[in-house]
């Protein structure tokens, strides 16, 4: 057996009973973005595939409406 035990990942949206992810909820969306603005994969976050698809769509809508930047690191 391994020396270290990892905590089991769980879907936060399933636990809270979320029906649909809202693109206007920026605090929730930012939890699933890296500091560069990329969407964190579900194998890292533990999000179910249904909610990962909704999350990706919500992030893309928020980016298009300029609620979230496409990238945070701009080298000048």
Curated annotation (Swiss-Prot):
ATP-binding in keyword set: no
Keywords linked to the UniProt accession: Ribonucleoprotein, Ribosomal protein, RNA-binding, rRNA-binding
A cellular component annotation (GO) from this entry: cytosolic small ribosomal subunit
MF term (GO), any: structural constituent of ribosome
Endpoints of the signal sequence: none
A Pfam family it matches: Ribosomal_S18
Gene Ontology annotations of biological process type: translation
Transmembrane segments: none
HAMAP family reported for this sequence: Ribosomal_bS18
Family named by the database record: Belongs to the bacterial ribosomal protein bS18 family.
Subunit structure, interactors included: Part of the 30S ribosomal subunit. Forms a tight heterodimer with protein bS6.
Name assigned to this protein: Small ribosomal subunit protein bS18
């Amino acid at each position: 057996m391994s020396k270290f035990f990892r905590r089991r990942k769980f879907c936060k949206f399933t636990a809270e009973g979320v029906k649909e992810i809202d693109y206007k909820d920026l605090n929730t969306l930012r939890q699933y973005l890296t500091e560069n603005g990329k969407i964190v994969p579900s194998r890292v976050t533990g999000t179910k595939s249904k909610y990962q698809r909704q999350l990706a769509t919500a992030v893309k809508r928020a980016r298009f409406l300029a609620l979230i930047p496409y990238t945070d690191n701009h080298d000048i």
